[in-house]
């Protein structure tokens, strides 16, 4: 149940992230951290990011670029790695036995792939 709640919070953050554009990784990190408690407009102003409703970022404001020449496949790859490292590793430690651990890893890995490719829904990881 805790993982479902955390995944829901992460999904909410991603929906917001698609509407904000920052000039740098520092700006993106600032915005993401600020959004934990702050409003979109406030965080965008403080972190020098721009909000857009079109889903396209203006020139000079990349959406998710981690490095200057990154592209979407790299972003999806790093998203999968981060999701698995933060969510799935935690679940492995919570498993009671090897079978439960195997099931958690399989379902969690699938959830991360769906999440990072943009087709995530709120599904239970124990289903």
UniProtKB/Swiss-Prot annotation:
Family label: Belongs to the plant thionin (TC 1.C.44) family. 4 C-C subfamily.
Record protein name field: Alpha-hordothionin
UniProt superkingdom: Eukaryota
Signal peptide: 1-18
Propeptide boundaries: 64-127
Gene Ontology terms for molecular function: toxin activity
Cited Gene3D superfamilies: Thionin-like
Function, in words: Thionins are small plant proteins which are toxic to animal cells. They seem to exert their toxic effect at the level of the cell membrane. Their precise function is not known.
A cellular component term, taken from the record's GO annotations: extracellular region
Cellular compartment(s): Secreted
Pfam families assigned to the protein according to its UniProt record, in alphabetical order: Thionin
A biological process from GO: defense response
Keywords tagged on the record: Disulfide bond, Plant defense, Secreted, Signal, Toxin
Disulfide bond annotation, renumbered to this chain: 21-57, 22-49, 30-47, 34-43
Entries under PROSITE patterns matching the protein: THIONIN
């Amino acid at each position: 149940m805790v993982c479902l709640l955390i995944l829901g919070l992460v999904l909410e953050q991603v929906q917001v992230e698609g509407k904000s554009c920052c000039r740098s990784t520092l700006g993106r990190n600032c915005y993401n951290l600020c959004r934990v408690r702050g409003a979109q407009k406030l965080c965008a102003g403080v972190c020098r990011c721009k909000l857009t409703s079109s889903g396209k970022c203006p020139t000079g404001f990349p959406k998710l670029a981690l490095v200057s020449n990154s592209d979407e496949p790299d972003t999806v790859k790093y998203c999968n790695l981060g999701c698995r490292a933060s969510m799935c590793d935690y679940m492995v430690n919570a498993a009671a036995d090897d079978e439960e651990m195997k099931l958690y890893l399989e379902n969690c890995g699938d959830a991360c792939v769906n999440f990072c490719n943009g087709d995530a829904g709120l599904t239970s990881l124990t289903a």
